[in-house]
Amino acid sequence: MIGLPAVLLLPIAAATPADDVKACLDRYDIACARQAAGSLGSDDASLAARAELEFALGEFTPARDHLKAASRSLASAEGYAERLALFERSAVATADFVSETRADVTVRSRPGFDAVLTDEAFETLQAAHDRIGPLLGGAPPGGVRMELYPTAQRFIDASSLPGSAVRTTGVIALSKWTRLLVSSPRALGRGYGWKDTIAHEYIHYIVAWRTEDRAPVWLQEGIARSHEALWRTDQPEPLAPTHASLLAEALANDSLLPLAKMHPSMAFLSSPEEASLAYAQVSTMVVYLRQAKGPGAVSEVLDRVREGRDALQAVADVGAGGDQAAFMAGWRAYLKGLKLVGRKLAEAGVVLDGAGDEYAVDPVLGERADLARAARIGDILLDAGRPDAALVEYRKAAPDGEPASPLLSSRTANALIALKREPDARKLLEGSVRDYPEFAVTRTMLGKLLLAAGSTGAAFTQFRHAVDVDPFDPASQATLADLYAARGDAPLSERHRRYSRLLQSNEPATR
């Protein structure tokens, strides 16, 4: 998601320094805006322009103060009060942040446990710049600035998104005002793929710069979702199983979402399922375009959109000789060729800032109190040393025809392990990881089984993925440190050992 800064200006003559700052910011050219700001004066229009530049740079307190100082003639201007309130909320949300810059990347975050994110945040952004930027025709000048918010509430305060929209769709990252606003994995009850999300938001920034912000949301999201893994791999990743399931169902029922419904933001769709379906649709459209015409096709589309071409027509121009119907028909044929398996899977609900326990974040048990009740009885029996009886209850929590539950799979695996049935537990966990790859607890359990069986390479893969989703488990960090040491990688072993020690210390409470 992307948005333009709205510089609050008085009706003034053209080509003033304030106009120049605005023009630079509209082009996402921070270096240009800095240079233009050198000619700003002390009039209200100049103060407002300086405030907008500072806001784009993440300097919220001076931005607020300069915009407030411009109130002599701007107080009654349309949007002034809302803009000033946003600057104030942003200043409060980041008041305890520290800033670190490496090369032309700046990351701001709260001291404490979120320090385990900063090294890999820098590495992800640098890799995205080096690997993805050239595919899209370059990257914005002036570097990139990112904030890592420790809670979803702070992200909401600083993002301008309604809290209700964030809680409905789970959108907890944003590219806006030439900055990346990203929530810590702690903001979601089970963590999330935050590094791919960083790359995703950076791609939004690139697309906005390349097109002068003329790309509609569906095209932005299609490019970002299809390219977000390319910072670490050479080809777009397959659809997540839950997304593939939703897309297969929509194709079968002829219930694909119209592109217009995705405007003005995916955050305003009606449910997590609808948002996931939208992402699946638009990302596969872009993957199809890449496969049909090569990786450079996306950059060609951006060139045309920048020139004012309608986005879908630009895609059709590059992908199907200008024939929109032919492109869409080709895309549908491509989807059929994927042989999407319509396995019944559930989409996890949105649980933010510790609002629920591990049952609440489960995609099945979080929605079915009756099944959760049976599973909780199983937990009691397992804790009492009665794994056979626990299995009976766990089976009640997984009736035929219902989607699989990742939490229930891990609980059942625990009971099987207690009964010395490790091969059965491993098979169950492997299936759960295939269906729900972003559940760290399942990957951690599978990793432990693989380690016990001497499969250190496979165990490393599971613990690496688990820590990528939820980096705040000190035990997983310690195990990953051991596995890096066994691979002869002393620097990464020490990094994750340091993270484990940090996570076992006391951290001040955050709001």
Where are these regions (language model features)?
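Bacterial Sec-dependent signal peptides at the C-terminal "C-region" and cleavage site
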Residues: G3-A18
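Beta/coil-rich, acidic/histidine-enriched accessory regions frequently appended to metallopeptidases
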Residues: T16-A36, D65-A69, E273-S276, E307-H465, ...
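Amphipathic alpha-helical substructures
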Residues: D19, R27, T61, Q235-A275, ...
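Elongated, non-catalytic scaffold/linker segments and compositionally distinctive motifs
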Residues: A23-F87, A91
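Sec-exported extracytoplasmic/periplasmic mature domains
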Residues: D26, A56, K68, R72-A75, ...
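Solvent-exposed, acidic/flexible segments
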Residues: D26, I30, D44, A56, ...
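TPR/TPR-like alpha-solenoid helical repeat scaffolds
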Residues: A48-L57, A75-A95, L407-R411, A415, ...
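Juxtacatalytic substrate-recognition/specificity segment
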Residues: D96-V217, H227-P236, A248-A260, P264-P272, ...
